Amino acid sequence: MHLLARDLHGLDDNEAAVDLGQTPAQIVFLSFSDAELSLLAELHEQNAAPPSLRCASLARLKHPYSVDLYIDKVARHARLVVVRLLGGKDYWAYGVDELATAARMRGFALAIVPGDMHSDERLERASTLSSDALARIWSFFRDGGPDNLRSFLGYAATLAGTPTHWLESAPAPLAGRCEQACRTALGANPPPHAEDEGASGQSSGAQAASAPRALVTFYRSAWLAGDFAPIVALADALHKRGFAVEAYFVASLKDAACETLLAQTIAEFRPDVILNATAFSARTEGGSVLDRADAPVLQIALATSTREAWENSKRGANGADLAMNVVLPEVDGRIFAGAVSFKAQTRARAASEFDEIRHSPEPSQIDHVAALAQNWARLRRLGHSEKRLALVLSDYPARRGRGGYAIGLDTPRSVIAIGDLLRDADYEIGSLYRDGDLVMRALEEAAHYVELPLAEYQRLFATLADDFTRQVLAAWGAPEEDPALAKGAFRFSCIEIGKLVIALQPDRGSRVERRETYHDAELAPRHAYIAFYLWLRHSRSIDALIHLGTHGTLEWLPGKSAMLGPSCAPQVLLGATPLVYPFIVNDPGEAAQAKRRASAVTIGHMTPPLVEAGLAAEAEEIESLLDEYASAATLDPRRAKLVAETILDVAERSGLAQECEVTRDTDRAEALARLDAWLCDVKEMRIGDGLHIFGDGPCGAAEASGLLRALAGRFVEPGPAGAPRADAPTLCRQAAISSASIRAMFRRAPPMISASARRAR
């Protein structure tokens, strides 16, 4: 059977068997790290004298048959096989066991060393070299860098029977300044969309002093391997937007030495925004060192997939990238900004039969991330009275009187509360209705509207991504065909009070199919919907958008699930506008959509206050009869029997018997026990009483603080749905029962729950 080598991993490294097509060599080196493999292949090619070398990625050797084939065709003919295994034996257990067996049968030397800082005794037992030799090999890679890997090649050649000069490994710093990616601000911070760095008219010294500051952090391993082109490209993009940039490499954000250096840098440099390319979560009880800047932390990904795989995928991020660069960093309160690079073959290294793979910058996404950083830094530096904000309300479902509907939130009163909050914080907010019903009536009846002329819309629409506009035209036709177009313009009902505009989110599709299309991941938005966001960004020139309540439609529009691209609808419409999203705390799954697809900062708000459900009249009658039965059971057994019959009659009449699976054939004691248990559960159940007003209740101050901190370009503490922190008992009391479980309880026994409980629905 002949197996073809695959060009590169796809979106997810699948485990199909492959033949790498390599020929035997005296030394074989295997690793999960493309950067490490590429650097070693480059160094070997610089002096391709004997012994020969083969480099291969362990990611290509996941299938057992691939392992068997590689050992048979390449490894068993070698004199020395070195494996650098990230994650311990469990990540490549079959390969470790088979290589260990082959080494002892065929007589080649085997060294399997950890791919990180953590030792694994199982790897040492599988190896055939001495502990000293294994420790030396591990140190070459742990210290890293070209000089140490050059010494490794010399030491490996010596072990393989060709004495070669080598030096003991020299430790490299665990953290440091990456000079190649540091930039001094030479011009002023350009205004949005400005291309001329000198447009402000300030002196160069004043411009440099007033320039925003960005701190970029990335992994030491990329610096040691010289594989940080995306970081340099990002620094250039930030610098073009007026930033002073400091870039630092770190072994880990949790390492004490790295923490110390970053803490000192943050204190001296005082960044307005941080762009972090390290993965996983770095948060401890005391938070992360990056929190000390009290600035937004944009999480960026150096993706492990190829650009082609990403471009052709609806998911966007593969499993590893999603976990490492998206999901886990959310725990630290980072704002996911997207991928800035993808893996690419840069050149073929014939001497080691290895195709060099490095991180290739993705220009469109680097520009998007730089714009996002600029706008968050702008929020941080602008005075509150200068900021232009939009407060957008959901408009679901399609029933009159439900405009601005959000799960668990009293939207009209929350609008008033947020207006008051912003006004008290010195935002330029005019007077607003004091009655929430009047607010909603003004929006629903279009008492005031703004418009985007068709000609202006067509001009802006022509600047959007071609793939996106093709989808829109295919679904909805030309802009002139949109029913919302009136008198040559798209009109939007809104309330303008100073520098705050309040509006209902337009329909993303046809009004009659709102419920069906609300979460449609395939249907492109209609022209009127697009026009609304273009008006906010280009005509209104908002600095930030607040979307109030769970939930809107922007984050559900077509596009990739994570790591969006320039044609994905949420990125096309929102652009690099900071999105702040008050979201109910007990729905983190849907909050994740906004975080991952719209770079939202979610501000968790509490569920409605909880009250006891209570019992309906028939249920109260049964409860009273059960009390009577309990008293009679010991004092008057004959009366107890009659009471029990009455209880069962009432239970049958009310439907409770069926709910508790009680029939006339059920043992009487068992039947009464079931009825009693059910009544106790329902009576003690707590359900929502009314709706929550943003900024009110036990966590109200934290909710308000979270919103104001986000709008000020400061760091927002993470939590459920981006929730404000509260003491555990309060959170337990307030969010003990999710809306889903309450709905399920209502479905189980609607007749037996009191009218007051039903009204709370």
Role assignments for model-derived ranges:
Residues 1-761:
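Ligand/cofactor-recognition surfaces for anionic moieties
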